[in-house]
Amino acid sequence: MRISIKGILDIAWYLVVFIMLQVLATYLVSILSLLHNGMDFGTALHYLQSHRVFSSTTVIATSAVSSVLTIVLFMSLKWTPVARSYVRSKPWAALFWVVLLSLGTIIPSAWLLEQMEVEVPSGLERMLNALMGNRWGYLSVGILVPIAEETVFRGAVLRTLLQLFRGRTAWLSIILSALIFGLAHFNMAQLPHAFLMGLLLGWMYVRTNSIVPGIVLHWVNNSTIFMVYNLIPSSANGNLVDIFGGSQQAVWMSLLFSLCIMLPALFQLSRRLKKAEPVA
């Protein structure tokens, strides 16, 4: 029983630290921004009690700083164990199918979100526009955030859940970690996509005991969304039918095409995702 309680407390602590690092990064970047604009330290602290510094630069810097702090802290404290064994196994074919799987999930996920008619909070929309509308935002959205989130939610949270429910089906741990991952986004607009992605990411972690496939899937997903946002500006506020020029038939065809990518990718990954062989 003591081990179970310790595991639960460990997971709670990981989540608290993850949130605290985001808050710390927000205040740190905001204060530095105000100091850079000529405000003294005391006045900056007082200003932040009732105001929020919001600009493309501060949003990007905050996201990048919190991600770097998260990666460094979790790995240095070994909350997320780091090993090169999976990469040394040269799983390039499996990672190729991970890329295809990620591409195949984007349109179905967007369609599902449309059917739920969940409104994106204005604050979240402003933050996403700030991140997506600046080329430097890709450093955070496309690279650092995938590594940080996989480090926390698969490398630490799911790993601990698997230990906590050892002897039971791994899917219990995968579902719980996916739910935690979805709720950690703190809004209903992102929860469905995050939960479904969490199931895939968790499944890949269990099959490989590595966060590398998850980072690749997460990277492709975020990179594709970033690219579409900048190449098709109407995608920011429009539905799929708007993106496809008002053709509902094109939407159905894109969904079918996505499934033709996603399902074979899942089949291939069910055969190819394996734990690295132990080094003799």
Regions found by a protein language model. Name each.
Residues 18-77, 96-97, 253-257:
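Alpha-helical transmembrane segments in multi-pass membrane proteins
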Residues 19, 23-31, 190-247:
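Functionally important transmembrane alpha-helices
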Residues 50, 219-280:
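C-terminal membrane module of polytopic membrane proteins
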Residues 72-82, 204-208, 263-273:
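Structural signal for the C-terminal ends of transmembrane alpha-helices
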Residues 144, 176-180, 216, 220:
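Hydrophobic residues within alpha-helical transmembrane segments
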Residues 148-176, 203-210:
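Membrane-interface helix/loop boundary segments of multi-pass membrane proteins
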